[in-house]
From Swiss-Prot:
Chain ranges of the OBG-type G domain: 163-329
Disordered as annotated region, ranges: 18-45, 351-386
Name of this protein: GTPase Obg
GO terms for MF: GTP binding; GTPase activity; magnesium ion binding
Binding site for GTP: 169-176, 194-198, 216-219, 283-286, 310-312
Family, per entry: Belongs to the TRAFAC class OBG-HflX-like GTPase superfamily. OBG GTPase family.
Native source organism of the sequence: Bacteroides fragilis (strain YCH46)
Length: 386
């Protein structure tokens, strides 16, 4: 089976650059016998920076580039010349990427907008040259600061797609059929469970050139929170949605029970998802006449808008779009910033294994003869912001 191009979970090793050494150069010129210190400052080490890029919608490009390392700052030189700063390492990521510490599971940052930049690891500051340490009683200091050391961290990048409406339902509930019917998206559709193996996004056109984004994820089954089926690992992609559209087919034995099962799986995954506005669509309703619809209506869950639809015949599609648009534009349904919970450390290694990301990514450092940098006592007042 070919490997999917949709990658929403990768582990990478990141390392910033260390600061360059300050110079200990003493000015020596023919007619300046007591020139004194003129050693320049070392350059700043490169930062590791995450940048949101709307042209990416998957983390596939990072699966084969697991080491992100910035450049080291260069040493200062004579005439108080600054060392060159190390090159920053820019990591382009899709909007909606969340970063966790791969060792502790702690939430680190979130990139949600195109062009947004987040400094993941700061480069070390360059060491001060010896001219900074000249005093009335110390005219010729023959020492300078080493640069600050680099920082390193192995991180998990987890993509959570950005959409307005998320489709929730069992396999074969008609989610992909609806998405293909009301948008230009072309998800795989077939009459067997788990046809959808990865999330799909579609832009739904509304009136007067307005539109909203809909996300379809693999179907959920009862027990998904215990590892059954495919859907649970993809639920992160509807965490950011303003509205959840529950889809249950008209031939269900008990629509209310199926709705409660789906609701419980969401609650198990993230209780905050129950705070989102919900709409219920009874799919495949072209098999029903008005009398059957009237019989089913009293048995439906209370307190949420509902509509009978058929993606094949077009029944109720316009009404559904009206309901979704109205709900999306209610002030009470405006999505708030997500509070990202840290990962459970006790389950983190198993999660990495399940996602195929349990490979060790440690990097072997090059020996550049700066061992004494590690022993230097860095004090904040010694540094100048550069």
């Amino acid at each position: 089976m070919a490997e999917s191009n949709f990658v929403d979970y990768v582990k990478i090793y990141c390392r910033s650059g260390k600061g360059g050494r300050g110079s200990t150069h003493m000015r020596r010129e023919k007619y300046t016998p007591n020139g004194g210190p003129d050693g320049g400052d070392g350059g700043r080490g490169g930062h590791v920076i995450l940048r949101g890029n709307r042209n990416y919608w998957t983390l596939l490009h990072l699966r084969y580039d697991r080491h992100a390392m910035a450049g080291h700052g260069e040493s200062g030189s004579k005439n108080r010349s600054f060392g060159k700063d190390g090159a920053d390492k820019i990591i382009e990521v899709p909007c909606g990427t969340v970063v966790y510490n791969a060792e502790t599971g702690e939430y680190v940052c979130d990139v949600t907008e195109h062009g947004q930049e987040v400094i993941l690891l700061k480069g070390g500051r360059g060491g001060l040259g010896n001219w900074h340490f000249k005093t009335a009683t110390r005219q010729a200091p023959r020492f300078a600061q080493p640069g600050e050391p680099m920082q390193e961290m192995t991180v998990i990048l987890e993509l959570k797609l950005l959409a307005d409406v998320g489709l929730v339902g069992f396999p074969n509930a008609g989610k992909s059929t609806l998405l293909s019917a009301i948008s230009a998206a072309k998800p795989k559709i077939a009459d067997y469970p788990f046809t959808t193996l990865e999330p799909n996004l579609g832009i739904v056109s509304y009136r007067d050139g307005q539109s909203f984004v809909m996300a379809d994820i693999p179907g959920i089954i009862e027990g998904a929170s215990e590892g059954k089926g495919l859907g649970l690992r993809f639920l992160r992609h509807i965490e950011r949605n303003s509205l959840l559209l529950f889809m249950i087919p008209a031939d269900s034995d008990d629509i209310r029970k199926d709705y409660e099962v789906l609701l419980n799986e969401l609650k198990t995954f993230n209780p905050e998802m129950l705070d989102k506005q919900r709409v219920l669509a009874i799919t495949k309703s072209d098999m029903l006449d008005q009398e059957l619809m009237d019989e089913i209506e009293p048995t439906l869950p209370e307190g949420i808008p509902h509509v009978f639809i058929s993606s094949v015949s077009g029944l109720g599609i316009s009404v559904l779009k009206d309901i979704l648009w109205t709900e999306l534009n209610k002030e009470s349904n405006k999505i708030e910033a997500i509070v990202h919970r840290p990962k459970d450390v006790s389950r983190l290694q198993q999660e990495l294994k399940d996602m195929g990301e349990d490979e060790e990514l440690d990097y072997e450092y090059e020996d550049d003869g700066d061992e004494d940098d590690l022993d230097y006592e860095y004090e904040e007042e010694d540094w100048e912001d550069k």
